[in-house]
Amino acid sequence: MRYSFGFTLAVMVVALVVGSAVGTPRTNLVSSACNGQKIQSGSSFYSTLGSLLVDLEGNTASSGYDYKASRAGSPTAYGRAVCNQGLSQSDCTACLKNLGGRIWNICGYAIGARVQLTDCFIRYEQYSF
């Protein structure tokens, strides 16, 4: 059976569109901005920030793909996470968990950071924004 070039091309385009809409999130580093000040060793901010990142990772997808939160501490940690709205909820969460695991390496324990992957973004600071 022979298929026309147009039919073959249409099948390939549909496969690419479906493949990009379903599957793993794209986690290539797009940009980062890291505060030059670092979290002090033994600082309570480290655990406060860790708790905030877990909250952002776990609640962004179920909160409309754009979620802000804070964790009381000394100092308080403020954060925001955003996902590409074309992702499934599980892919949004997976992207943010990937980023949460890499943010320390990208920004070297900075007291504030903004990191954008292709399909998700996290920002955290010691001040409200």
Swiss-Prot record:
One of its GO terms (molecular function) is D-mannose binding. Residues 1-23 form the signal peptide. The keyword Transcription regulation does not apply. The keyword Signal applies. Disulfide bonds join C34-C107, C83-C92, C95-C120. Alpha-D-mannopyranose binds at N35, R114, E125. InterPro entries: Cell2Cell_Antifungal (IPR051378), GNK2 (IPR002902), GNK2_sf (IPR038408). Exerts antifungal activity through its carbohydrate-binding specificity. This is Antifungal protein ginkbilobin-like protein. It comes from Pinus pinaster. The lineage of its organism: Eukaryota, Viridiplantae, Streptophyta, Embryophyta, Tracheophyta. The gene is EAP.
